[in-house]
Amino acid sequence: MAMKKKREGKNTSKIFDDHDHGMCFDDAIEQIENYFLKKNLQFTPLRRKVFEILIRDHKPLGAYEILEALGRDGFSSSPPIAYRVLDFLMKHGFVHKIQGLNAFIACSNPNHSHSPAFVICRKCEKVAEIDEKKSGISFASPNIENFEIEKTTVEMTGVCTTAQERQQCNAY
């Protein structure tokens, strides 16, 4: 599957155009296969399918949307099974949970250990994982006495320029 073509134009939401996981579908699958092989983990058909659903859609999906897609593809649509797969993929850095949307998204940078940061359009619900170095924003964990931070996730909510333009012409 090829990457989506970038939109041209002065007022498009560039951060979402640049996102699309920075790799094509096949590259993402190859990365996860290599990781599982290197770590001696099983890339079961169910784990593969859940990851394919998330990487294919390039958007956050709720657990029940993932369950529906699994059911359509002939897999078990049992919530406990799906949540175990999602937890496993999150543990290994291939999926992130977007708390503000109660949804899951494939990681755009799975080969690097990082604390993810996301921008979320509250109008169109597009989500982009942003890179700390490229954005110029520092996500450094604060040094808090008597507390060890295990994970930091930053979610910034606003309205993208595309949604702003649609709002001006009452498309929402």
Task: Say what each PLM segment does.
Residues 1-40:
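N-terminal leader segment of winged-helix/HTH proteins
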Residues 43, 57-62:
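Short capping segments at the starts of secondary-structure elements
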Residues 48-53:
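Pre-recognition alpha-helix immediately N-terminal to the DNA-recognition helix
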Residues 54, 82-92:
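Basic amphipathic alpha-helical segments that dock to polyanions
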Residues 65-71, 82:
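A short acidic, leucine-rich amphipathic alpha-helix
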Residues 91-172:
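Non-DNA-binding regulatory cores of transcription-related proteins
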